[in-house]
Amino acid sequence: MSVITPDTVEILLTVLKAVVILLVVVTCGAFMSFGERRLLGLFQNRYGPSRVGWGGSLQLVADMIKMFFKEDWVPPFTDRLIFTLAPMIAFCSLLLSFAIVPVAPGWMGADLNIGILFFLMMAGLAVYAVLFAGWSSNNKYSLLGAMRASAQTLSYEVFLGLSLMGVVAQAGSFNMQVIVDSQTHLWNIIPQFFGFLTFIIAGVAVCHRHPFDQPEAEQELADGYHIEYSGMKFGLFFVGEYIGIVTISALIVTLFFGGWHGPWLPPFIWFAIKTAFFMVMFILVRASLPRPRYDQVMAFGWRICLPLTLINLLVTAAVILYHAQ
């Protein structure tokens, strides 16, 4: 009896696809750190990284070498086990969030019927990493940053989930592949424009990106919950943040802009172009908007985003019921 059966081959191909996709995501997250610095330099009329390699092309390699050889110091006053687990949980949860995103027909890490719920679960799991990092560091700035991050993330995850319910109701499924197929003739950005607005705002807040980077506010908290981290532990937090940006950008494309659908070019190329556009938008927002106060961030979520998502969901339900009659 042969060990290699059609089922075994299918499982191996699925695992291989998942590994390739996740490796590409990690690479994109790493390269985004270099791209962000170059674009910020362009936006601010100055040079970005330009010393290592031609035009700064090897800056990422230099940063990786520096990160690998930095001392991985654990302060003696920390809870060593939790302190070490926190960056691993943060990195893995953000990376696994991308597994449900279809980058082309048949190309996704995990074809789950509850794809959107899986993403929300992974986003919620990242909150534990932040809390673990802040509490185990035994530092007042870390703890304050972790408390801010957990309150902000849990609040905006409510709007993140509600903004997706209109898309789910229209497609009739939580499966990402089904949602993409439902946009063959009309992208969800048109009927779900308010859902898109609240999703992109909540996505920025969940990623702790400027202007919602209150947990890491340098002027107030001296870099927040990862102030005590160094070496590869800090590197996992750092790359994880950019992986979060890649994931949110890919989800925006998948849920509201037709995923891989587009004329002439191959599906994967269309998906990459659309995702890159929103990644640049994240950087542009960082370069152009000021940071509001923490109470203003929370008030904006509960007073503006929550009513907007509920109105969008109510209107979507009314339209679906009208067409069903």
From Swiss-Prot:
GO terms for molecular function: NADH dehydrogenase activity; oxidoreductase activity, acting on NAD(P)H, quinone or similar compound as acceptor; quinone binding. Pfam families: NADHdh. PROSITE patterns: COMPLEX1_ND1_1, COMPLEX1_ND1_2. One of its GO terms (cellular component) is plasma membrane. It catalyses: a quinone + NADH + 5 H(+)(in) = a quinol + NAD(+) + 4 H(+)(out). GO terms for biological process: aerobic respiration. It is a multi-pass membrane protein. Its EC number is 7.1.1.-. It is found in: Cell inner membrane. Belongs to the complex I subunit 1 family. NDH-1 is composed of 13 different subunits. Subunits NuoA, H, J, K, L, M, N constitute the membrane sector of the complex. This is NADH-quinone oxidoreductase subunit H. It comes from Edwardsiella ictaluri (strain 93-146). The lineage of its organism: Bacteria, Pseudomonadati, Pseudomonadota, Gammaproteobacteria, Enterobacterales. The gene is nuoH.
